[in-house]
């Protein structure tokens, strides 16, 4: 009789990862927990350390847990990226980057060190092996589906990853937590970025980057004709689609339509001016399909809570893609991800590099 497969499960301290661990044990896996530390004092050489962390008082769900301090890597790859994107006039998505650079990096490092077979997380997503390809699918709960944040994962990573919660709703997970005696069964979810206090990114940036406010204050706010209609506190403190706090009066609502970091300038316009009919995405990662060499139709999401919309994707050189939408999208921000779907399956995605390019791409592959 073969021994059970050994799974490293990422534990955040919340209800989802705890229930995922319990389900793996119920399914017969040998489970080891990994709690990744990202806000501790950095270590020169991160090592696995035993932890007293327990998710339940039940002996059935008592399993070894280790911690891994990745604070230095987190500061560089996630916090540093967050700062750089705002300073470049983009809108970053740190949770998306953290999944790839921290969570899966740490899980695979623990899998290597502990000679385990698989890794698992509490994300609401699914995988399916079809035609010798591991497909990434949406979770069945449309309110909790987290597939949008996982587009950066590769075939090698997905083939070794389990998502125990993908077939459950959040309400069902809460009920399972209570039945398993999970300590975090009633713990509220946090929607905040873990290193940004009170989810106030403006105050955070002002404190985290010395001299930022003095350096960027007083830039111009211009309308769609280029006319100066006011001044702002600094371009990093604004986001695409923002309406409140602009301090300008035009007689009708205006929204941030463009952030020009080079000239410390904010462009504003009407809601119609926020429409995006096409974009260029860079850093493409294709999951369930080979890198395309000709245009094809799919559906796209340009933010986490966005609905899937029909689009045409045209591959470009330098691992980019031109994306045109059948119906215009609202408030598309550079720095966010555009993720492509075929129904429930994630095909891939990329980072939005340019919104409403002036002309169709000149160099298309194929």
UniProtKB/Swiss-Prot annotation:
Molecular-function GO terms, alphabetical: ATP binding; tRNA binding; tRNA-uridine 2-sulfurtransferase activity
Chain positions covered by the region annotation Interaction with tRNA: 144-146, 303-304
Site (Interaction with tRNA): 123, 336
Binding site for ATP: 10-17, 36, 122
InterPro entries: MnmA-like, MnmA-like_C, MnmA-like_central, MnmA-like_central_sf, Rossmann-like_a/b/a_fold
Gene Ontology cellular component list: cytoplasm
Catalytically driven reaction(s): S-sulfanyl-L-cysteinyl-[protein] + uridine(34) in tRNA + AH2 + ATP = 2-thiouridine(34) in tRNA + L-cysteinyl-[protein] + A + AMP + diphosphate + H(+)
Compartment(s) of residence: Cytoplasm
GO BP of this protein: tRNA wobble position uridine thiolation
UniProtKB keywords: ATP-binding, Cytoplasm, Disulfide bond, Nucleotide-binding, RNA-binding, Transferase, tRNA processing, tRNA-binding
E.C. numbers: 2.8.1.13
CDD domains: MnmA_TRMU-like (cd01998)
Gene3D superfamilies: Adenine nucleotide alpha hydrolases-like domains, HUPs, Translation factors
Active-site residues annotated for this sequence: 98, 194
Disulphide bonds in the chain: 98-194
Function of the molecule: Catalyzes the 2-thiolation of uridine at the wobble position (U34) of tRNA, leading to the formation of s(2)U34.
Record family assignment: Belongs to the MnmA/TRMU family.
Database matches in PANTHER family: MITOCHONDRIAL TRNA-SPECIFIC 2-THIOURIDYLASE 1, TRNA 5-METHYLAMINOMETHYL-2-THIOURIDYLATE -METHYLTRANSFERASE
Protein name: tRNA-specific 2-thiouridylase MnmA
Taxonomic source organism: Chlorobaculum tepidum (strain ATCC 49652 / DSM 12025 / NBRC 103806 / TLS)
